[in-house]
A protein has these predicted regions:
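Glycine-rich nucleophile elbow surrounding the catalytic serine of serine-hydrolase chemistry
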Residues: 150-160
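Conserved alpha/beta-hydrolase "acid-adjacent" motif
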Residues: 289-296
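Accessory cap/linker subdomain of secreted extracellular hydrolases
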Residues: 82-83, 91, 125, 160-275
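Cap/lid segment of the alpha/beta-hydrolase catalytic domain
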Residues: 53-137, 187, 325-335, 451
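Alpha/beta-hydrolase fold nucleophile elbow
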Residues: 140-152
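N-terminal cap/lid segment of alpha/beta-hydrolase-fold proteins
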Residues: 23-56, 458-464, 477
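Short beta-strand/loop motif that positions the catalytic acidic residue
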Residues: 276, 282-284
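C-terminal, loop-rich substrate-recognition/catalytic regions characterized by aromatic stacking residues
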Residues: 221-236, 328-495
């Protein structure tokens, strides 16, 4: 049997010229200044500004982060300025701004996870506005045009920058953006607690008393050492897991809201995405185990709720954030067109250059509305704003005898049963280690065949390739012998 499924979308981009000083040490090209920018409530946010020494006006790109924007101190530059993703902005002479968000690392104030827009006198939109306003008035040689970019949690802050309303903000790129921590990103997947990731991640996000440099911030939690699966099988009660943590207000508050109630709903980024003024470039990966949901669904929300916003989507065959550093995943090499160099040259750099350097805010960037990479033929495909246009609906039926078929079963009644043992849950990867491997998203799943708690339905071998575009919905009719259950449905390719 074969089902070849690709979530495919894509685009073609512009070639961008590289500045003449490409390859020079960054200290020869840039000056660094550190500021504590006062917000409207007098809370000061640590902000590092890297300004090109070359004469002339330059656009500003801002990266706001809860993870620390070190190295701190005069004359010290991030290692990423020498090569890779950030080097693209160095070589193009952007004014690069990095800021610790409120309550994190060297910034003052109280940190709040996914602080909702409009939740008080200050939030991430007001902090973004106040930062931009200070920068355009105080940083020499800026051209008055500002962008925000960020990946994962910083992707949330990038979108908040796009919602801040400052007229200088012309373009933003939320990448793998935290959008809804209950429905799909990081903490839950379809409302089911993603325990391995959320427990490790949220326990690492406690801010210690006072402001300390990044080198002294707590490292990623080691609560799940030495073996992740064994750890969680030995600590099955949520209260027990909570007791192993240092005091963690967000974990405790989250645990008190097991359902999609108003507390979660107000933390859905999409609720604020109306009448968005800057252009938006959303980036995601089909094999992103953390925040795949955010990219697709933020794009849909913007098209529906803010139709006049120039909005672009790029989704490649990447794990979380891998468009910034690689083209391979596990045993698969998706080719040079999936490399970070290709991504930057064809998508991100042309996007920001168009709106920030060239100032073409009256016309859309020369990018497709949506570009998606098909991991079957290793090609980019382009789409209009509505991703499923031209596609046809496909229904697959689970039939008796473990058959997966496009034809509706003729039997009037049919049932498949299994017994799930909580003491031996179905593993998501064949080998359990210190933490979840990103490669599990493309790993061979046949090690699960034959387990008594897994039902497998297999089609006839496909006679030709099949490309899947759009969401996959599972419609199950079930009878339980217990009070509740979570179901995981996988549509996979046997090759």
């Amino acid at each position: 049997m074969k089902i070849r499924g690709f979530f495919a979308l894509l685009l073609t981009g512009l070639l961008a010229a590289v500045a003449a000083f490409a390859g020079q040490p960054v200290a020869e090209l840039y000056d660094k200044a550190e500021y504590r920018i006062a917000m409207r409530d007098s809370v000061a946010l640590y902000t590092a500004v890297y300004t090109p020494k070359a004469p002339g006006e330059a656009p500003v790109i801002i990266f706001r982060t809860p993870y620390g924007c070190g190295p701190y101190g005069a004359g010290r530059f991030p290692q990423g300025f020498e090569k890779g993703y950030l080097r693209s902005y160095v070589d193009r002479g952007y004014i690069i701004v990095m800021q610790d968000v409120r309550g994190r690392y060297m910034s003052e104030g109280d940190f709040e996870h996914v602080r909702p827009a409009g939740s008080g006198e200050t939030d991430e939109t007001t902090d973004s506005y106040d930062t931009v306003d200070w920068l355009v008035r105080h940083i020499p040689h800026n051209n008055g045009r500002v962008g925000f970019a960020g990946c994962s949690y910083p992707g949330f802050y990038a979108m908040m920058g796009g919602l801040c309303g400052h007229p200088a903000v012309k373009a933003v790129s939320p990448q793998a953006p935290v959008t809804d921590w209950f429905m799909g990103d990081d903490v839950h997947h379809n409302g089911v607690l993603m325990l391995t990731d959320s427990y490790r991640f949220l326990s690492s996000m406690n801010t210690p008393p006072g402001r300390v440099p990044a080198a002294k911030m707590p490292s990623m939690s080691r609560q799940t050492q030495p073996d992740e699966r064994t750890f969680f099988l030995e600590h099955t009660a949520l209260a027990e897991l909570t007791g192993l943590l240092k005091p963690n207000p967000f974990w405790e508050e989250m645990s008190a809201h097991p359902d999609y109630d108003a507390w979660w709903q107000e933390r859905d980024l999409r609720r604020a995405c109306y009448n968005v003024q800057p252009a938006v470039l959303i980036v995601g990966g089909t094999f992103d185990a953390e925040d795949c949901f955010g990219a697709w669904n933020l794009y849909r929300a913007l098209n529906r709720q803010s139709p006049s916003t120039p909005c672009h989507l790029v989704v490649g065959p990447w794990a979380h954030g891998a468009w910034r550093n690689g083209r391979t995943l596990g045993a698969f090499d998706f080719g040079s067109d999936a490399s970070w160099e290709y991504y930057m040259e064809h998508f991100e750099v042309p996007f920001f250059d168009h709106y920030l350097r060239d100032g073409n805010t009256d016309e859309a960037a020369p990018l497709p509305a949506a570009a998606v990479f098909s991991s079957g033929d290793n090609r980019w495909h382009t789409f209009g704003r509505f991703l499923s246009r031209g596609a046809r609906k496909l229904t697959l039926y689970l039939a008796g005898g473990g058959i997966l078929d496009t034809r509706r079963p003729t039997a009037k009644t049919s049932a498949s049963t299994y017994v799930s043992d909580p003491s031996d849950p179905v593993p998501y990867c064949e080998v359990s280690g210190l933490r979840r491997p990103k490669e599990y998203m493309v790993a061979d799943q046949r090690f699960l065949f034959g387990r008594p708690d897994v039902l497998t339905f297999v089609s006839e071998p496909l006679e030709e390739d099949m490309t899947l575009v759009g969401p996959v919905d599972a419609d199950l009719e079930v009878t339980l012998s217990t009070t509740d259950a979570d179901f995981v449905v996988k549509l996979i390719d046997l090759f």
